A protein has these predicted regions:
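Left-handed beta-helix
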Residues: 1-141
Length: 141
């Protein structure tokens, strides 16, 4: 197929997506899998599981992780500020959040959303929950 495209005068240009304004990877389990296990498949196009963050050890995007904070394995932090006394458990995802001395358990998603009026609302659920189902942390609600 590529030969036919080239033969007809079309050129293909690779676009580096990282860092970018927004890339939608699908479900929470899919982004966690990408950040923790699948990033090696995309290194050739310049992707990295640590982008524009103050750490070189935690999977993160546009985040500040203050020295002294604890982020356990297989967690992903995006657009967040984690202060020195904060603790994030294993396999958790924090997005658009600032935590100072909070302890985030294993397998938790905390996602902040800025509203048009400037206020922020947060949603919290289990890493394997589907927000479209009537379950929270795997239990019926």
């Amino acid at each position: 197929m590529w030969n036919i495209i080239k033969k007809n005068g079309f050129k293909l240009k690779q676009i580096k997506l990282s860092p970018s304004a927004m890339i939608h990877f699908g479900s929470i389990p899919e982004i966690m899998n990408l950040m923790n296990k699948g990033m090696d498949d995309f290194r050739d196009i310049g992707w990295n599981n640590i982008v524009n963050s103050s750490t070189d050890t935690v999977n993160s995007y546009n985040s500040i992780l203050t020295p002294g904070c604890t982020v356990q394995e297989n967690s992903y932090i995006e657009i967040s500020y984690i202060h020195e006394k904060a603790k994030v458990g294993k396999n958790s995802l924090l997005s658009f959040i600032e935590i100072e001395d909070e302890v985030i358990p294993d397998d938790v998603v905390i996602h902040g959303l800025k509203q048009n009026n400037g206020k922020i609302v947060c949603r919290i659920f289990g890493i394997n929950d589907n927000p479209k189902e009537e379950k929270l942390f795997g239990k019926a609600i």
